[in-house]
Amino acid sequence: MGLHFYECNLSVQRKRVCSLEKRQMKAPKYQTAYACEGKKLTIECEPGDLINLIRANYGRFSITICNDHGNVEWSVNCMFPKSLTVLNSKCSHKQSCSVLAATSMFGDPCPGTHKYLEAHYQCISAAQTSTTTNRPSPPPWVLSNGPPIFGNGSGLIQAPPPPPPRLPSLPGVVGIHGINAVPPTHSTPSSSTATLPGGRLKGVTSATTKHPGGRHDGLPPPPQLHHHHHHTDETVPTKSSSSGSTGNVTSPSNTRILTGVGGAGSDDGTLLTTKSSPNRTPGTVASTTNSSLSIGGTGAGGVVRTINNINLNAAGMGTDDESKLFCGPTHARNLFWNMTRVGDVNVQPCPGGAAGIAKWRCVLMKRLPDAGYDEYDDDLPVASSTTPIPPSSAGDCLHNSSSCEPPVSMAHKVNQNQRLRNFEPTWHPLTPDLTQCRSLWLNSLEMRVNQRDSSLISIANDLSEVTSSKTLYGGDMLVTTKIIQTMSEKMLHDKETFPDQRQREAIIMELLHGVVKTGSNLLDESQLSSWLDLNPEDQMRVATSLLTGLEYNAFLLADTIIRERNVVQKVKNILLSVRVLETKTIHGSVVFPDSDQWPLSSDRIELPRSALIENSEGGLVRIVFAAFDRLESILKPSYDHFDLKSARSYVRNTAILSNDSDAATGDMQQRIRILNSKVISASLGKGRHIQLSHPITLVLKHLKTENVSNPTCVFWNYIDHAWSVNGCSLESTNRTHSVCSCNHLTNFAILMDVVDEHQHSLFTMFDGNMRIFIYISVAICVVFIIIALLTLKLFNGVFVKSARTSIYSSIYICLLAIELLFLLGIEQTETSIFCGFITIFLHCAILSGTAWFCYEAFHSYSTLTSDELLLEVDQTPKVNCYYLWSYGLSLTVVAISLAINPSTYTQNDYCVLMEANALFYATFVAPILIFFVAAIGYTFLSWIIMRRKSRTTLKTKEHTRLANVRFDIRCSFVFLLLLSAVWCCAYFYLRGAKLDEEVATVYGYCFICFNTMLGLYIFVFHCIQNEKIRREYRKYVRQHAWLPKCLRCSKTSISSGVVAGNGGPGVGNVANNSAGTLSKSKSKLPLSATDEARAVEQQQQQKDVPAADDAIIMGAGSDSELNEAQQRRTLKSGLLTGSLQPTPVGAVVLERGTLRSTGMASVGHASPTSSAGSTHLIFAHKQQQQLQQPGEAYYHQPDYYSWKHPQAGQREYYNNTGVTANAGIGGASPSQAHEVFYWTQKHNNQHGKKKRGGNAGAVPASPSGSLHSRVTAASQVLFYPSYKKTSGLKQPPATQAYPHYAEALDPPNAAYYQQQLQQQQLRQQRQQQQQQLSSDEEQAEQHAHLLHLQHQQRRAGGPQLPAPPPHMAQYQQELLAQQQRQQYRNKHSNCDLSQGMGLGKGMGMVLGDAYYNQGGSSNGGGDGGPVYEEILSNRNSDGQHYEVGDFDVDEVYNNSVGTGVFNSMRAAVAAGGNRYCGGSLSGGSVTSRNQQQQQKQKQPPRRCVADDDDDDDDDEYDDEVTAAEQLHDSVCDDEDNDSDIDDDTHGLPPQSDERMRRLMALQDEDFKRRFQRQQRKNGLPLDYGASAQTASINHPEHNGAVFGVSGGVGEGSMRGAYRQQQQQNAKSPSARLAVNELFGHGNAGPPLPPANQTPAQKRQQLQKLSPQSTTSSSSHTSHSNPQHAPAHHIQHQQHHQQQQQARHLSAMLDENNTVRCYLEPLAK
């Protein structure tokens, strides 16, 4: 059979020029010759061929060769090391030779053994011999993995094969004096010309064989096998094409990781893998021909056994048929193993002196690529060791039951070599399987022990002698342990034949001594190769049999002894102690062994006295102790699991060797667990696992103290033949010892993990890019978390101090700790002192962070199910509870974990995770899952409740709060999912990277992405999306000059208002200390809505306003910003520079946190807050008369003085009905005296909500809707003057309905200014009394108390306060007495303006029961002070607590108007009131709502309903009122009063916002009905749109228009109907203005008079406006000729502007959970 080769030449330019030339060559035959001792060995070749010796030995390796008589006593481990040298000197390169096999020629390596001479050789041609050195060459299949190539027609150049796999050494072998070193093999430097695939020469290189001389991975070295094998250095004949020099290349050995499935000796044909680290450098290729497993021996002359991995493939590389690959021939266990096809099992007879068969399997192993191996580099040699099959090998193929395949072309090989280039055949397992090989002499002993008359003592002695002197095989181990157990069973029956007790004890003791000696021999190092002949399952089975056999024989002796005695059997590897103790002599624990008995180890086992007493029998306790040496090398643990199922995979998972040439490879090694202590045993019953009530204590010394961790206490399970942890626990451990506690008795030891000697942190797993990305990701997240925390702390004035703010602060703190600890932990190694601390704190931080997320979801749920939806205030008790449960529970869990097993935090490979054990899942995974599921559950419930509420609530504050809660729930849910993704990716990445999984990289980059997104999410959705935070950022940036110029660029935005006043104890002082200016942008705030074209004109118009010269900007609006150029600017300077849009004089904007941030001196003053949007408080005092345009009546309200005394050239028209307002630039601007307060928010048009009254001719819409508007978002709170009711007799219709305007229309009356004069006199008296008070503190205290009483009196609806007493004491007593007489109505809200001051039924309705006006009768003693206490639905108010600042006492008692008209009104109003309130802020619960509905159902039907008069009906009114109608009205009045009393009796709770829609409808109906009745009583038309029948001068009585809360303008709406009436009578001075038209009174009729002036201001007005001066003018003149207005009116206006002071607006939360606001009194 011929082989085809290719000849390739390489040009000077290194271009490959190959000419294929087929030549035939006869492959040399591999031959073996033997010669017995005393005879000649003759070697002869054919003519033309020369002898090439491969290996030789003089001695004996086989018991069958040259043994005609079957002598089994000869040694089979006999070798003369210089046999090959002697034979080469006689036969090398000769055609024939003869050598005498005698001791005189070779020496006597083993006297007493019949020896033989064995030689392996080839007959090669003389031409081949001329190109090589005199070194012997190996067989052709050893020379190369590729076809031979002829260079230049001579010299055979072999294609260098890749390094074959490094076979792993046998694990767990530890010598008694340390680690056994492997004898190094010979290394020969040589040069070679490497040939690449395709015939291209790579160049001349040199390589030196290096064999391992030590271990660098911390594992035990390969075991020493006492087998004599031939050692030969295989050389490759090479020749350089350029220089012609030749050399021999000695192949290096490469050790690989053996991984795969299937146990040793298995025939399953499993594909295994091996890890290869080829030693390749550019331009240099080492020619490798074999892979060696070096096994040293302890006998004379150590040898090395070589395993040649040869791929016998006729086609070379390139075939897809794995059956074409072969394992090379080798020697192992005194047998020659010829080449075997992959997947086949080589079976042959056992070595000489043993019966049975031996087998060894050839498998295909995958070479795992590493850093030095390029899988796709075609310029490198093919990673295979396939060679063509020589013709002479056909017989070998047949001998191995395999067939030889025909050749295939080289081109096919090159195209197909990629598939199998990473695979190569390997013998598996590490050693042949000799389980069925049994020595002949052991068979003889087994037959003897089964005989009836055999002597057990003799058999035991023979067995101990044979095992100490003979080499055993795997089958011999099984037979030996079986004989030991058989002898114990037989002795159990034979001992009864010995009647004498002493004789019985002596015989059993002798038997026990032989058994112990035999067991020690089996554990000896010399028999380690016999253990390796067994597969792992059989090894565990033999070890279990040995332990049980020793225990059975020991208990034979213990049961024989009947008195207290201690028998100790001590041999080389076993210490056995049999103790029989009397219970009465046991005074403490029993300790084994004694310090002087077992010097090999300091292990100790301690049995408590209670455990011994419980297991006593007949007053005696029988104990068997045993300590073993070298048993730890046999009872190897399986990978990760200590049971029989995984024992099969131990070899492939634990035999890990690093490449000797590259000890610092970056490949991750798999987990290795070793037995790191001696095995110690204790038993109280033969073969029984006795459970003890009190555990025993074991102290075990570590065999290896470096690079080991995770000690685990285990015992040997006889049933599973594996180590188990059941019943044992680790008490404590240190570097050298571990203390264990077990509740049963058996064989104990310590298992530990092997750690790589080169400690690596977690970042060693990362590639360069991932390491950088992790740093960047963590840094980004940390920066954004810090920004969020600083935002919450620095801008705390923006936020409500609520539970949600505290929760998010805690979440940010926990996340910051997690990020920093993770960054520190991944840089630490397991040996670092900070490793355990970092893991502990990280555990606590993760648990706390997850708990806070759960509490955040719970808080959202509780907010939706309680009144907290409308009142988001500081909830300190609840937050403290969250703190306790979060941090307290986390610390408790971590403390429990530390108490159970502290080493859990230090046993993991890296310092960011706990060890994955039961404690990890119980204390880490379980709490996190509980918190996570709870958070998801509460979020789901919150979403359901929110959806249900959104369908049942009005578009009021509750609806807005629901929208805010909905947004918070969404953000929190996304936040929770994102954080869970971050932690899950981090966990799976760490676990995967630890096991070197490919998917770990994917998890790593997912962690980087999610962690970065987490930081961005925190910054965007928790900081940037909040409008107030954005505004604070802009302020902060523009106020700090150290920031970059690009960040502090100036922008323009709308002004949010200014503070009026020039100093004073109110807002003005604070305003003067504040900083910043405002500019204008497009906005919808209730300010001037002029366009840009009129900005300059209005700025010039504001120059002459004295009261605003020193006004300072109080705070920026939602879009306002502080100008960087002028950080402190007054209103006047802002108007002059053009950066400030003119605004109403005296308007104040109090924004969220403004007062707090500007250092308000008043305690507790803070502006209302909101979770979204901006809230503004407008203080429209002394508002300037602006140019009025259509749609601006809401903002620019005409004032009383400008109406009464118009400026020259100025005419006032209302509702744009032919009258213009023309204020000259230089003229004094009129001002309005009454005050308007309201909260409002800038309108959002994109919500698609209809603006009320936006059509032409109607009242323009407010920016954000008005009171209880049904078509707009009711988002404002109004504070307006609620005029006190007046009671008295019914006046004739001719009486003036507007007494305030009467003095202007009819100067002789001057009722208003006469009242002012009376109030001034009373005020002077009061000042004299106040001066007698001791101090200002007492004044403030008494005043506050009196004001509180007056406030309760006003809300209780009782009678009016009496006239002021002469001194304060009497005044206070009378107030207290009157308070006791009043009946407090608990259902009052702050908007209950229609409640009567008295509840008596005897007083009828006079002039309307709900009309409010200022002042009372002269003798009624009622107060006329303004009360600013109306708060309606404000969807942004969070209901903070405010300090109370009420009015001055003087103002309360001097602010009455004594007219008979209002005396009669007081009596009329006292009889009834409005039943409903539309402005309650009380959220109300479900129970209260149900009660209210039930109570309403129980109410009888009302007989008094509103008349169905159409608002648009223009029929004339019949002046005659029938008696039936009057009776009907009287009955209705009584019914109304009765219903009010019924409400008081039942104690109805405050109305809830959920009933707002129904209440508003009922209010409209009730108001309409009352209005119609009042019209009948006053003789006025019932139709709203009817024109007034009275003259312009003789004003009719007030029509009793009530305050309606309806916001509609259509039919049924009081406001809409009355607006029509006002529009039709705009020029009529008799037009009436109800309080509900406070913000729309510019459309018709004159404005309200000054109702809020203090006595000082009123006295000034009286001085300026005397009755004599006012007499000269008339109402007609005032209206028709404004140019003739008296000068003192203008002077009074200017003086009034200069003296006006800004005041605080305070609020408090009353007993009905209603926020009530008050105006601060002016300074005395």
Swiss-Prot record:
Summarize what the UniProt record says about post-translational modification: Proteolytically cleaved into 2 subunits, an extracellular subunit and a seven-transmembrane subunit.
Which sequence ranges are listed under topological domain Cytoplasmic?
A: 793-805, 854-879, 946-972, 1022-1724
Where does the record place the region Disordered?
152-292, 1089-1108, 1244-1268, 1315-1343, 1482-1555, 1638-1704
Feature: compositional bias, Acidic residues? 1507-1522, 1532-1543
Main location, first listed in the record: membrane
Tell me which residues bear Phosphoserine.
1167, 1262, 1269, 1334-1335
Alphabetized, the UniProt keywords read: Cell membrane, Disulfide bond, G-protein coupled receptor, Glycoprotein, Lectin, Membrane, Phosphoprotein, Receptor, Transducer, Transmembrane, Transmembrane helix
Q: Which residues lie on this side of the membrane: Extracellular?
A: 1-771, 827-832, 901-924, 994-1000
* Species this chain originates from: Drosophila virilis (Fruit fly)
Q: Where is the composition biased (Basic residues)?
A: 1244-1253, 1686-1695
Question: GAIN-B domain spans which residues?
Answer: 565-758
Annotated TM spans: 772-792, 806-826, 833-853, 880-900, 925-945, 973-993, 1001-1021
Ranges for domain SUEL-type lectin: 35-124
Which is a Gene Ontology cellular component entry for this protein? Answer: plasma membrane
Annotated positions for site Cleavage: 745-746
Assembly with partners or alone: Forms a heterodimer, consisting of a large extracellular region non-covalently linked to a seven-transmembrane moiety.
Region (GPS) spans which residues?
A: 713-758
Instruction: Show the taxonomic lineage.
Output: Eukaryota, Metazoa, Ecdysozoa, Arthropoda, Hexapoda
What protein does this entry describe?
Answer: Latrophilin Cirl
Q: Which GO terms describe its biological process?
A: adult locomotory behavior; cell surface receptor signaling pathway; proprioception
User: Per the record, where are the segments of Pro residues compositional bias?
Assistant: 159-168
User: Which cysteines are cross-linked by disulfides?
Assistant: 713-740, 728-742
Compartment(s) where it occurs, according to its Swiss-Prot or TrEMBL record = Cell membrane
The answer to whether the entry has keyword Transmembrane is yes
May I ask which residue range the UniProt record assigns to the signal sequence? none
